[in-house]
């Protein structure tokens, strides 16, 4: 029984890490879009910081991918692609 509880705990940890990475990637994507539209230096700097944070979080969450559902893996891949398309070359 302890093994099942341990597995469940690991799965939950993996799931939360992947979900957090996806949310951060979505936030960074929105920040980059806003910065592109506004061309305000502060917005651009903020968006670049969000992008870097999201990329680091996605990289850290990759180790958890084998332990989450196929649906979560798809969402993760979409978030990763979204960020790769929105790299901070804003001008």
Regions found by a protein language model. Name each.
Residues 1-91:
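Long, charged/polar, soluble alpha-helical segments
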């Amino acid at each position: 029984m302890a093994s099942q509880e341990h597995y469940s705990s690991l799965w939950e940890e993996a799931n939360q890490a992947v979900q957090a990475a996806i949310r951060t990637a979505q936030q960074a994507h929105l920040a980059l879009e806003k910065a592109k539209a506004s061309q305000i230096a502060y917005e651009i700097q903020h968006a670049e910081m969000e992008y870097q944070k999201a990329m680091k979080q996605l990289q850290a969450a990759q180790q958890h991918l084998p332990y989450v559902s196929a649906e979560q893996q798809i969402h993760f891949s979409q978030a990763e692609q979204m960020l790769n398309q929105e790299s901070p070359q804003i001008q």
